[in-house]
Curated annotation (Swiss-Prot):
This is Cell division control protein 15. The gene is CDC15. Homodimer. Interacts with TEM1. The keyword Kinase applies. Its main location: cytoplasm. The keyword Magnesium does not apply. Phosphorylation by CDK1 reduces the binding to the mother spindle pole body. The extent of phosphorylation gradually increases during cell-cycle progression until some point during late anaphase/telophase when it is rapidly dephosphorylated by CDC14. Phosphorylation inhibits kinase activity and dephosphorylation by CDC14 activates CDC15. It comes from Saccharomyces cerevisiae (strain ATCC 204508 / S288c) (Baker's yeast). Present with 238 molecules/cell in log phase SD medium. PANTHER family: SERINE_THREONINE-PROTEIN KINASE DDB_G0283821-RELATED (PTHR48012:SF26), STERILE20-LIKE KINASE, ISOFORM B-RELATED (PTHR48012).
Length: 974
């Protein structure tokens, strides 16, 4: 039986030193394996006490000093919920740490036995004990650094024992990351900002989630996305959790570690102290005893499949369990030569690998394998046996044999044997690639998708991007890539190809939109995110010609795109070529327009590029089929790239706009977005999503071939938000109004008028139906915009166009009679004192709304019409006086605004020498004088009612000369 005798250096606690002079331990079975080494169950020969002995491998004195410093701290810890430290045994390059044996294994094992996880009441006992242990540790200045269910052990009576703090973290911190501890790590640790005792509180919260759901937060994300989620996202617990528990978790998951509660504070939390079905006083009845119960160590704690870096030294093999069994059966162990001879034989394969590694040197094992693989023909049974040896080496021997095999030049011999090569793919891909596994005949022999994708992904890091893309074009099976899209490596490869390989648009995209793949795409938000992001890249990088011709343009300002055949810019007369037109006309956007999405290689398409891109057949149908599915996805990253893809699609092919206009699922999707975004903290991404949606809706309103109540209703919802989407909503309303005026015919004549209450405009779409446009909502939007808002110029331009339309005199009157009208106008001029164009736009707007209001309320010679002297018209006369009083007030302000002699005037005021500004001010001033509105040929022309048939004909024939700005057809005294 193996033992650790007193010939080795044994360091004991004071109690042990007082009771015995030497200690000998019998090593029983292996109960754990991990990044740190091996854990054995052992028995003290003198006392029969069962202990756990952890083997820690170190490589140099520096690592040994780190371990010894931690041990010096551990030996002073003494708490019921901390695994007791008994001492250590030091050998050449191993350190054996003697710890308390926990018969019931880890809490992870207990959780795994449940189909759904522990209940809240069950978990409270374990959480409370864990907090007691953390309170003690933190009071001693110790940070655990790796709290999770696998590191919370249970004694024979189910008392919680915190284990694996300090030692394994110091010895191999990178191994912890590889083991998957990212899901439990606090943001300050992931961000390399340093750990504190409060970092353990975050990990405790993740462990509570693990107890109740069997998985930690963000368990379905890749490593890169876990980093992002922990740092930036808010974790929302399942709805089944009680409110006290949700509050408990919210306190654990505070991103600022200095605002997190301590373990002592959490012990006082209402969730911990609620006593329903829980008797907390039972904790005090737990007693420790060391029974020789059957071990219950679970696979999670053993971490049998860790990807760790092995030691550079060829260390002594682990103590052999076979010796104990052989002594009992009175057998002698085989010799090294016997084992190596058996290893070469294909007729009698070696099955006891533990014996092989205990007796034979690593060099001799590696040399024997190389000798066999060098034969002309190699038996398949030998290949299988060698594969098992490498697997055992990885799991139980720190990969020392694999390192020796590489050093002795064995890799070229396994290239043609996938069963052997796969054992090196994950840990040593570069070595395989350097030995020629990516050479086409060798690569073609590989059949396992996981290893193929891993090698292709690693090949990217070792070659140039251009070469890698060309290689993938020739040798990568696209169907294999897409059928394994659930694999992390497949997702990474797809993103890289879509970003850098121009051929991905023609070779990958048609296969990606196959309806058979849709279910796989929707398996998880991560996959959906990758697919939509990749297609965005493919569209914007599919051809070198597009790269050269693409000019960055704003995806949020459709008015800056080339006018379509139905654009109001080409359909409504304007009295003059105005600065409004200059601001609204087509112009190239700044190259920094897409700074917020600078991680995109290219994400804009110029008008020239639109002609070069032809989307695959069925692409639009495939894309729109996701509108219903998006209702189940709350991930903003997915929605961001989905909406961007929708915008790019209709921007490339405007014929899809009318198809989208008839798609009820599209408008339902917008309503669903409206319910999700208010509860998301990522304002930047939310703004980007709305930017794409409103851009699509604006383009739809420009190209629509029929009036859409759904689009109109959506636009009104945008307006009611009173934010950046409101301007787009107003623009859509304007385009809808222009559409009704453009498409008047003799059978159905859509008109714009007002109801008797003057509270709404009725936009008639046919003889039986009309859409209501509330005046008060338009007025509220005008006054809701801040004076310094960057959208002011656009707002004034759109309001000018709407107010100039026939039938909207009531809107102009309501704007003027608003209590804040004068203050708003003064504030506008004060804010934009240095902008000549905006001041001109404001003056034109003022002139328009006063002239239309006066024409509505007054007769057209400046005198009340005696024929209309009814009681309502007498009230109109009082309204006229009120309106003129406001006009006089505005005129006085304008007189002083550019007057250099006024003391309070801004010294940097521009426009005082502008002929156009002077003329506009004079026009506005003249409106306050009687007789200023000359008699015109028709009342309908002056007021701005719907045009006659002849007028409509003239309107359409002159649309190519129009800039979209119209006022009532009248003249003013100047």
């Amino acid at each position: 039986m193996n033992s650790m005798a007193d010939t080795d250096r044994v360091n004991l606690t004071p109690i042990q030193r007082a009771s015995e002079k030497s200690v000998q331990y019998h090593l029983k079975q292996v109960i754990g394996r991990g990044s740190y080494g091996v854990v054995y169950k052992a028995i003290n020969k003198h006392t029969d006490q069962v202990v756990a002995i952890k083997e820690v491998v170190y490589e140099n004195d520096e690592e040994l000093n780190d371990i010894m410093a931690e041990i010096s701290l551990l030996k002073n810890l003494n708490h019921n919920n901390i695994v007791k430290y008994h001492g250590f045994i030091r050998k050449s390059y191993e350190l054996y740490i003697l710890l308390e044996y926990c018969a019931n294994g880890s809490l992870r094992r207990l959780i795994s036995r449940s189909s759904t996880g522990l209940s809240e009441n069950e978990s409270k006992t374990y959480v409370t004990q864990t907090l007691l242990g953390l309170k003690y540790l933190h009071g001693e200045g110790v940070i655990h650094r790796d709290i999770k269910a696998a590191n919370i052990l249970l004694s024979a009576d189910n008392t919680v024992k915190l284990a694996d703090f300090g030692v394994s973290t110091i010895v191999n911190s990178s191994a912890l990351t590889l083991a998957g501890t990212l899901n439990w790590m606090a943001p300050e640790i992931l961000g390399n900002r340093g750990a504190s005792t409060l970092s353990d509180i975050w990990s405790l919260g993740a462990t509570v989630v693990e107890m109740l759901t069997k998985n930690p937060p963000y368990h379905n994300l890749t490593d890169a996305n876990i980093y992002y989620a922990v740092e930036n996202d808010t974790y929302y617990p399942p709805s089944s959790f009680s409110e006290p528990l949700k509050d408990f978790l919210s306190k654990c998951f505070v991103k600022n570690m200095y605002k997190r509660p301590t373990a002592d504070q959490l012990l006082k939390h209402v969730w911990i102290n609620s006593t329903e079905n829980v008797k907390v006083d039972k904790l005090n009845k737990f007693k420790e005893d060391f029974t020789d119960a059957d071990y219950h160590w679970d696979a999670d704690f053993q971490e049998e499949k860790l990807n760790i870096s092995p030691s550079k030294f060829s260390l002594a093999a682990a103590p052999a369990a076979w010796a104990e069994n052989n002594q009992e059966l009175d057998l002698m162990p085989p010799t090294e030569s016997q084992l190596l001879s058996q290893l070469k034989s294909s007729s009698k394969p070696l099955t006891d690998l533990h014996v092989l590694f205990s007796v034979c040197s690593l060099e001799n094992i590696a040399d024997t394998i190389i000798e066999c693989l060098s034969r002309t023909t190699v038996d398949k049974r030998l290949i299988t046996a060698f594969g098992s040896i490498f697997v055992y080496d990885t799991q139980h021997n720190h990969s020392r044999l694999r390192l020796k095999f590489i050093a002795m030049g064995g890799i070229p011999l396994i290239i043609k044997f996938e069963h052997l090569a796969k054992e090196f793919v994950i840990d040593y891909p570069q070595t395989l690639i350097e030995c020629g596994i990516m050479y086409p005949p060798n690569f073609a022999s590989l059949k396992t998708p996981k290893y193929i994708l891993e090698l292709v992904y690693r090949f990217y890091d070792l070659t140039s991007t251009a070469f890698w893309c060309r290689w993938c074009f020739k040798h990568l099976d696209i169907s294999l890539l897409l059928n394994n899209i659930h694999e992390r490596r497949a997702q990474s490869i797809l993103l890289k190809l879509s970003s850098y390989a121009p051929w991905s648009f023609e070779k990958i995209l048609p296969s990606l939109i196959d309806s058979k793949l849709k279910k796989k795409i929707l398996i998880s938000p991560q996959i959906t995110y990758v697919v939509f992001k990749s297609i965005n890249y493919m569209i914007t990088t599919n051809d070198d010609k597009i790269h050269k011709s693409a000019i960055p343009s704003s995806s949020s300002l459709p008015l800056s795109s080339s006018p379509t055949r139905n654009s109001p810019v080409n359909s409504v007369q304007s009295p003059s070529r105005s600065p409004v037109h200059s601001l609204m006309a087509t112009r190239p956007s700044s190259p920094m327009r897409h700074k917020s999405i600078s991680n995109f290689p290219h994400l804009t398409i110029s008008s020239k590029s639109r002609l070069l891109i032809e989307l695959p057949e069925g692409f639009f149908t495939w894309l729109t089929s996701f509108f219903v599915d998006m209702a189940q996805i709350k991930d903003l990253s997915v929605l961001k790239y989905f909406t961007k893809l929708c915008y790019l699609t209709v921007h490339i092919n405007s014929t899809f706009l009318n198809d989208l206009l008839d798609n009820d699922a599209f408008f339902a999707f917008i309503r669903n977005i409206d319910t999700i975004i208010p509860f998301i903290d990522d304002a930047k991404t939310a703004a980007f999503i709305w930017k794409q949606i409103t851009a699509i809706c604006v383009e739809m309103s420009l190209d629509m071939d029929q009036m859409s109540a759904s689009l109109f209703s959506t636009a009104m919802n945008f307006i009611r938000k009173k934010n950046n989407t409101s301007i787009s909503g107003l623009e859509i309303i304007l385009n809808c109004l222009h559409f009704t005026l453009r498409n008047v015919n003799d059978d159905v004549a859509p008109t714009v008028g007002s109801s008797e209450s003057h509270s709404v405009f009725l936009i008639k779409v046919n003889n039986d139906a009309a859409i209501e446009l509330p005046i008060d909502q338009l007025v509220d939007l005008f006054y809701a915009l801040n004076d310094d808002d960057v959208n002011l110029s656009k707002l004034i331009s759109i309001f000018t166009k709407i107010c100039s339309l026939p039938g909207f005199e009531n809107l102009t009157i309501n704007i003027i009679f608003h209590p804040n009208f004068y203050e708003k106008i003064v504030s506008f001029f004060d804010t934009y004192f240095n902008s000549l164009l905006i001041q001109i736009d404001l003056l034109k707007f003022i002139k328009l709304i006063f002239s239309k209001s006066l024409l509505k309320l007054y007769d057209y010679t400046g005198q009340p019409d005696p024929i209309k002297q009814t009681e309502p018209n007498r009230r109109n006369k009082a309204t006229v006086f009120k309106l003129r009083a406001i006009l006089v007030q505005i005129t006085e302000f304008l007189n002083n605004n550019w007057n250099k002699d006024v003391p309070k005037r801004n010294s940097n005021q521009v426009g005082g020498d502008s002929v156009l500004i002077c003329q506009l001010c004079e026009d506005i001033r003249s409106l306050s004088k009687k007789g200023s509105l000359q008699k015109v040929s028709s009342v309908t022309a002056a007021i701005g009612s719907s045009p006659t048939k002849d007028e409509r004909s003239n309107l359409r024939s002159s649309k190519d000369k129009s800039d979209g700005f119209s006022v009532p057809i009248t003249t003013f005294q100047t």
